[in-house]
């Protein structure tokens, strides 16, 4: 029977790099707009792509992020027109981000402490992915399911000697 430390590898999935979460999530495009586009265009794109945010790029570089929350708070509640308002007027800048080497726990901490639902992943100057709060919740659920499975196997004595 394996010892309890052998189970610890399954409990430390939060220490895995964001790169592992992106790999598990699969290759999803990161949708973007420029600061000069209308908020209407950005919201239309989010709706068509079924995403809650877009990265804002200037010359291929991350300039900010625009989300449904930005739209609700900075356009709708202020009585502004989405067809006349530019993305640059409501985007969140500078955008918070993580690198692929940061841990899943780091990403969770940033999202929780800063109360954001989306976090771009930057490798150098390139946006290589987007984490959502849903991605992190799925990671937690999968991690807990794996831990439960391994604990059941451990209790049942199904680990090799």
Specify the residue positions occupied by each region the protein language model found:
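Tandem CBS (Cystathionine beta-synthase) repeat/Bateman regulatory domains
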Residues: 1-161
């Amino acid at each position: 029977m394996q010892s309890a430390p052998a189970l610890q590898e399954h409990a430390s999935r939060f220490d895995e790099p964001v790169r592992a979460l992106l790999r598990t999530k699969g290759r999803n495009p990161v949708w973007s707009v420029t600061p000069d586009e209308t908020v209407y265009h950005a919201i239309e794109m989010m709706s068509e792509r079924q995403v809650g945010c877009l990265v804002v790029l200037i010359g291929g570089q991350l300039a900010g992020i625009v989300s449904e929350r930005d739209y609700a708070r900075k356009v709708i509640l202020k009585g502004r027109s989405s067809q006349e308002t530019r993305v640059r007027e409501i985007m969140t800048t500078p955008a918070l981000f993580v690198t692929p080497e940061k841990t899943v726990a780091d990403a969770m901490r940033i999202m929780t402490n800063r109360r954001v639902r989306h976090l771009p992943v930057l490798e150098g100057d390139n946006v290589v992915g987007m984490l959502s709060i849903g991605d992190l919740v799925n990671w937690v659920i999968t991690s807990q399911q794996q831990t439960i499975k391994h604990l059941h196997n451990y209790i049942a004595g199904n680990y090799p000697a």
